From Swiss-Prot:
Organism, scientific name: Lactobacillus gasseri (strain ATCC 33323 / DSM 20243 / BCRC 14619 / CIP 102991 / JCM 1131 / KCTC 3163 / NCIMB 11718 / NCTC 13722 / AM63)
Lineage of producing organism: Bacteria, Bacillati, Bacillota, Bacilli, Lactobacillales
Location(s), subcellular: Cytoplasm
The protein's role, per its UniProt record: Specifically methylates the N7 position of a guanine in 16S rRNA.
Major site of localization recorded for this protein: cytoplasm
Family annotation (CDD domains): AdoMet_MTases
UniProt keyword annotations, A-Z: Cytoplasm, Methyltransferase, rRNA processing, S-adenosyl-L-methionine, Transferase
Protein name: Ribosomal RNA small subunit methyltransferase G
Family per record: Belongs to the methyltransferase superfamily. RNA methyltransferase RsmG family.
Length: 239
């Protein structure tokens, strides 16, 4: 997917990129490749692949569930790595307030430089483990939306993310083709943490056989205070 086809696909979904937005994605790609020589951010470096498997893939929740992102919403991206999915979404939705939580300082240095290069405002970087962020009173139950992409299986991701969502907020999980199996495994965790599965959308990336699944979990009640458990526990002993 070259940049022109990327723009066409977005236009087909009702998102016409301005010249500024096209330039922001081009800058994003160049910065990613440049920084990737120093810090391992991605194994995908071919331009067409980055536009498809990072940029377009990150934007799929916005294309499928655009109403969730309307207005001046707050979004917390857990374990964003190189900024996926939150920063491609931010480029298309400038009114969004983004908070990125990541545990690796080198990745945050990249993100800090990238945000500056893209001239993005209302983006906050938090150097923290997800479990610690969920117990931080400045972050816990503060966000309209929480996203996670390629972070952990659904039962673990739920414990990382649901505590950060406001009641009536949403977790949007970007998963691969085996998400239904993960959902069965995560049923108890989602319920215990105060969530309810609202929607599961299966899709294929354009002109490929690459299957993706988007899972939307609505937070219907407050998360019990003991969750998330201390760092490392959710992964070792999933709910």
């Amino acid at each position: 997917m070259n940049p022109e086809i990327f723009a066409e696909e977005l236009a087909n979904h009702g998102f016409k990129l301005s010249n500024k937005q096209k330039e922001q994605f081009a800058t994003y790609y160049n910065k990613l490749i440049e920084f990737n020589k120093k810090v391992n951010l991605t194994r995908i470096t071919d331009k067409n692949e980055v536009y498809l498997k990072h940029f377009f893939d990150s934007i799929t929740p916005l294309l499928e569930f655009s109403d969730l992102f309307k207005g001046e919403k707050s979004l917390c991206d857990v374990g964003a790595g190189a900024g996926f999915p939150s920063l491609p979404i931010k480029i298309l939705c400038p009114d969004l307030s983004i908070t990125i939580v990541d545990s690796l300082g080198k990745r945050l240095k990249f993100l800090d430089e990238l945000i500056n290069d893209l001239s993005l405002d209302k983006v906050t970087l938090v150097h923290s483990r997800a479990e610690d962020a969920g117990q931080n009173k400045n972050l816990r139950e503060k966000f309209d939306l929480v996203t996670g992409r390629a972070v952990a299986r659904m039962s673990v991701l739920s414990e990382y993310c649901i505590p950060l969502a406001k009641v009536d907020g949403y977790l949007v999980a970007l998963k691969g083709p085996k998400a239904q199996d993960e959902l069965v495994e995560a049923k108890n965790a989602i319920e215990v943490l105060g969530g309810r599965v609202e929607e599961v959308k299966e899709l294929t990336l354009p002109d490929t056989d690459d299957e993706r699944t988007l899972i939307v979990v609505k937070k219907v009640k407050a998360t019990p205070k003991k969750y998330p458990r201390q760092a490392g526990t959710p992964n070792k002993k999933p709910l």
